[in-house]
Amino acid sequence: MQNKGFVRVFAILLTLVCVFYLSFSFVTRHYTSKAKEFAKGDVKVEQDYLDSLANEKVYFGNWTLKQCREMEISLGLDLKGGMNVILEVSVPDVIKVLADNKTDEAFNQALATAAKQATTSQDDVITLFVREYHKLAPGAPLSQLFATQQLKDKVTQKSTDAEVEKVLREEVKAAVDNSYNVLRTRIDRFGVVQPNIQSLEDKMGRIMVELPGIKEPERVRKLLQGSANLEFWETYTAKDVTPYLQAADTKLRAIVASETPAEEADSAATEAPAVAQATSTADSLAAALKGENKTQTADLAQIKKEHPLFAILQVNPSGQGPVVAYANYKDTAEINRYLSMPEVQAEMPKDLRLKWGVSPYEYDPKAQTFELYAIRSTERNGKAPLEGDVVVSAKDEYDHYGKPAVSMSMNTDGARRWAQLTKQNIGKSIAIVLDGYVYSAPNVNNEITGGNSQITGHFTPEQAKDLANVLRSGKMPAPAHIVQEDIVGPSLGQASINAGIMSFIVALILLMVYMCSMYGFIPGMVANGALVLNLFFTLGILSSFQAALTMSGIAGMVLALGMAVDANVLIYERTKEELRAGKGVKKALADGYSNAFSAIFDSNLTSIITGIILFNFGTGPIRGFATTLIIGILISFFTAVFMTRLFYDHFMSKDKLLNLTFSSKISKNLMANAHFDFMGKNKLWLTTTGAIIVICIAFLATRGLSQIIDFTGGRNFKVQFENKVEPEQVRELISSKFGDANVSVIAIGTDGKTVRISTNYRIEEEGNNIDSEIEAYLYETLKPLLTQNITLETFIDRENHTGGSIISSQKVGPSIADDIKVSAIWSVVLALIAIGIYILIRFRNIAYSIGSVAALACDTIIILGAYSICWGWMPFSLEIDQTFIGAILTAIGYSINDKVVIFDRVREFFGLYPKRDRFQLFNDSLNTTLARTINTSLSTLIVLLCIFILGGDSIRSFAFAMILGVVFGTLSSLFVASPIAYLLMKNKKGTEPAVEVAK
């Protein structure tokens, strides 16, 4: 083998990279175990322990625990539990605001039509709106709609339609970006570990948010869907507010003393000045938490009795500026509780508002210290004197000294009020507040007129950009609404982990046994070693991407292992052929690798094509599956083709392993001299296939498919009861209360206690409280089946499984459902087209392309038909969802592998035997690849059966579709793709009678 040195170096470097990234997971597991041991079951103490170490360098002196947790392999929501939502910023609402809410009939009608068409069209709302408006108002320029005060610097009466459309796209993108920034900040403040938030670039206005470990979904819904509230406030100085804080601390001391037993209150303590005592409080708390200084812990407890507030709040000693105090982030909740007490509020001025800064104190970010600002309310109604809706634009730039700054422009009304506000606060600070947190508090040097301002300070370029984003958020024209939602309880996630690990281990063991039994111990173990390396490299690469490992990702990994065996099977089968031809082991193995390479390359590349399409058109779990599948295929190509070759070359260069036969007693003569007349009955095969296709289409037309809410829109609730229930009993209860809404109930698992309830009840309605109202309504409806003492709070608690509760839920809005349906159709069609084009390019004969695509289309129709025939009476769900579409595409990718291998052999035989008739040539090609076809199919079926039996309910339907795909894909290679390709080519050269094969 050439380039051995490169392969070795690459393998070593890849191994080091994978070890490096996987090591972070071991570090975090170590500290998580220490936290659990320290906490002894107290979740809050465990989290406080980890938080106290978050910014400590715990790995090689370079990486903090927080950074290590960001680098580890995280678990997806279906394994860890949590919440996945897709939010949508209404593009039509944004366009209305940009047009100043015009009442023009053509404008409103065009916008309404565009919004409706967008659910099924591949074009976005802006394109559809422009097209419809031109139909309704021919010749009317778009500038007459959008030459508004808000867009005065971007659109004029002379602007062309193309220029206006460009501005609309920029403004809509800015609105979505603003929403993204607001959501990101809210989530960061919420304290979720390893959140994932991303704009869905292929869908205008949509943002996906994944929040692992969430236990309060209703709180999250309100957090995510609330409108951004940007405000400008006047401020106090620290020296003005410190006396009030001292009075509050004194009041709290009395409150704490009254709550403390008398014998504890008698302890003698030396009273030090409150502010001085609080100076090192953050360090003391961290040390106490870790148990490093018991004396310090006792002293701290005494300080908190004497000065409850100042023990955790350090007053600004300079007395200058609006920052009155500092506190560690884990103490902010307790400080808020203290400051909200009526007794403490009575000590404060009526116009004082205390608000936290949004980010840690810039001079001490490691300690996670936050600043407390003193806001002054001067309006009678208690509102801010100026709000963000007056901001027209904001951008980050550099001032005349070359330092980062932020420029801001306001509308006419805002400019007038801004001039008044700045005039009254010369020499003081004005706080910029978003969602209740202070982002900046610049000092006013002089009155600002005209509405144009420049904010300067000690900004980094990133901070200037963030502040500009905040200011732009103030004019966000439409809040984001949840259009899709999935909630998984942690115990359900643990069950998925157990099922996934079990299916993975059993599949790996069976694959190893199978390879050894078919090809002998040493070749089998070499192939098995490649599988282990495949797993190691795949996990390492996933870790380097900071990707989350999901149940579908585990399935993709397991399936990639099954498909990885295909490369070893191809190599070993070709090697056996060369050995039977009389070659020595060295030469046979070298030729085996060489002759199998093109088939391995083409089959892997076609699978990657379907994986890429799957990734681009899928969302959530489908993307996770596609990612692991693509990585697994790429790695399997490297390990099977190059790494195993290094092993054999190393030993055979020393004249070792020269007695290998690459077979066992079981497989020695398996299909070695097969002479099946496949082509002689090609018309029978095609007629039979045609009849099956007609039957499948008839069932699809009459019985249809059981579509889940991914395609219809609606809500799913997976409910676990204390006792066994009948699905029909549950359905009747719900149907009697949910009116005309569609309701379906199916059993989940085998214990008879868990059901999945699907309904489209009130799915068209939007609002922050709709989901909680429906959960409450469901609780009232199912009360007769619940344990008597179950409350609503217990019922909706995803962690509770006693007496009956919701353990997971899912919501898919109508617009999302339509998009998923369109994307599913396009993904399958594009996969077929892409594969057909690739086969044409590689084999340079359209007969191969037509045969392949026709066979793949047959596979797809037969799988759909089987689901149509079987749903309703099989003991597991056969509903059509995004995962099923993923299975279809994966089956297509697997099926084309087989066809590529056969056609590659046909192409090879054309070169070796140019005078042999096509009839015999096709038969010989099918017979010589039959052993590979059987071995690959069996090895893949072993994996799929493990997933099907052991993988759990969530992945069983996927495995069933894949099993159908493997079975029918193998058959279609022999009885559809090959006969069609043969029939299309046979007219180019005469055929000989079928008896010629038997000579």
Where are the predicted features?
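Interfacial helix-loop-helix hairpins and adjacent transmembrane helices
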Residues: 1-17, 21, 25-69, 73, ...
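Hydrophobic transmembrane alpha-helices and their membrane-interface caps
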Residues: 517, 521-571, 849-908, 975
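Cytosolic juxtamembrane regions of multi-pass inner-membrane proteins
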Residues: 562-606, 647-655, 868, 874-936, ...
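Hydrophobic alpha-helical transmembrane segments of membrane transport and translocation systems
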Residues: 8, 12, 533, 538-541, ...
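Juxtamembrane segments of multi-pass membrane proteins
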Residues: 698-746
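Juxtamembrane "pre-transmembrane" interface segments
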Residues: 210, 451-454, 462-509, 777, ...
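Pore- and gate-forming transmembrane helices of large, multi-pass membrane proteins
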Residues: 183, 491-511, 563, 578-619, ...
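Non-transmembrane, solvent-exposed regions of membrane trafficking/translocation machinery
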Residues: 23-31, 51-60, 68-435, 439-443, ...
